[in-house]
From Swiss-Prot:
The lineage of its organism: Bacteria, Pseudomonadati, Pseudomonadota, Betaproteobacteria, Burkholderiales. One of its GO terms (biological process) is arabitol metabolic process. One of its GO terms (molecular function) is D-arabinitol 4-dehydrogenase activity. This is D-arabinitol 4-dehydrogenase. Its EC number is 1.1.1.11. It catalyses: D-arabinitol + NAD(+) = D-xylulose + NADH + H(+). It holds the Pfam family Mannitol_dh_C. It is an enzyme of class 1 (oxidoreductase). Pathway: Carbohydrate metabolism; D-arabinitol metabolism. SUPFAM superfamilies: 6-phosphogluconate dehydrogenase C-terminal domain-like (SSF48179), NAD(P)-binding Rossmann-fold domains (SSF51735). Keywords: NAD, Oxidoreductase. InterPro entries: 6-PGluconate_DH-like_C_sf (IPR008927), 6PGD_dom2 (IPR013328), DalD (IPR050025), Mannitol_DH (IPR000669), Mannitol_DH/Oxidoreductase (IPR050988), Mannitol_DH_C (IPR013118), Mannitol_DH_N (IPR013131), NAD(P)-bd_dom_sf (IPR036291). The keyword Oxidoreductase applies.
Amino acid sequence: MTRSSLARAPVLLHIGAGSFHRAHQAWYLHRVNAAVPPGERWTLTVGNIRDDMHATLAALAAQQGAYTLETVTPQGERAYETIRSIARVLPWSADLAALINTGADPACRIVSFTVTEGGYYLDEHDRLDVTHPDLAADLRGARSTLYGALAALLAERRQRGAGPLTLQSCDNLRSNGARFRAGMRAFLALRGDAALLAWFDANVSCPSAMVDRITPRPTDDVRTRVHAATGVDDRCPVMGESFIQWVIEDNFIAGRPAWEIAGAEIVADVHPYEEAKIRILNATHSCIAWAGTLAGLTYIHEGMRDAAIYRFAYDYVTDDVIPCLTPSPLDLERYRDVVLERFGNPYVLDTNQRVAADGFSKIPGFIAPTLAECFARGADPVATAVLPALFLGFLEGWARGTLPYVYQDGVMDGAAARSIVEAPDSVAAFCSDRQLWGSLAGRDALVQAVRAGRARVEAWRAARR
């Protein structure tokens, strides 16, 4: 549903209207549009590739794209803001007709997307995993992955002569823009579509970005608080911490909103920022979630109150990550302290279940690089080795059915995971898994480090009993 007053404004199409997008990018655009003249505003259209967000999309559509964002500080101060940047909500269909039509319209200048690390289907060498059934189906013409959907969208855009387009990653994949571009090029080449590949090279930019705002899955409590504070019975409110950050590579081929007006940082090189965020925030978050689950805790902030879990996180960053990332344009010690303070926010109520998910993507993406760099410089990664050891213990709980919740992992091979934990030497089996470790798999240094980490984790667990 388009607001007529904004009908011909430049359009940003976002794929994935989940909580994070609505607490982050949509908030930025709302703030930008409020600060610029009407003629400089952009409109936001949202849709989805998969039919797994029907309730959210229906609620957004019923509210004309508007919804309430609740933010909360570590001190418990709550604020409420009605976000009005979404001008159109696309209905889902199996052929993605509305999504493709919108992205192929000349008014659309940016298509952005938020996917998990596994949603890129890339191995450690940035090669497409063509053995994955979804990707294999898309190579035959289906539209179930980001690549298949965007290939159809780009083909239609090229046919219409709709002009250049920016494809913008808004997620936690390291070097997301460059790696997505490599994946998209490989996908088109494997399809044998030389003409579309040439058009892509000449007409599409793919900026990298670092995004940050802790955004839990909404609960009914959020809706209740929103109603009490605003009087609005919002069917799709979203809640997040007060902290927000967005660092974007300045690489837009068809224009962009003035993101910096709302506080985004436009830079030539995102790499130092994303490395700090992925290793210090994302990996530490996973550490706390896995440890907290093993300790019988429910929320992230509870783990931060546990002296041993806090120490696991603090030592990992201080002893191993900061030396790996030095020198840096960031004050890494200060960043560490801010991150740990954010994790201790008891009002966000971020669950271990949410943060613990997708370990088979997080080990290679968030943790393995620090181990590899420690090995390369001759350092013993004592603190970092605790993190994969925690995940191995967590994986054993999953296999035995003792986790207190359903574990979600988009790329885990369940049979392979069970074979790891059932092996006579589960540490060696774990460290030999190439999906987790890539070129590190099977190395003696890795096995020894994780075995030592495992001993520390087991001693910690025994002391809690």
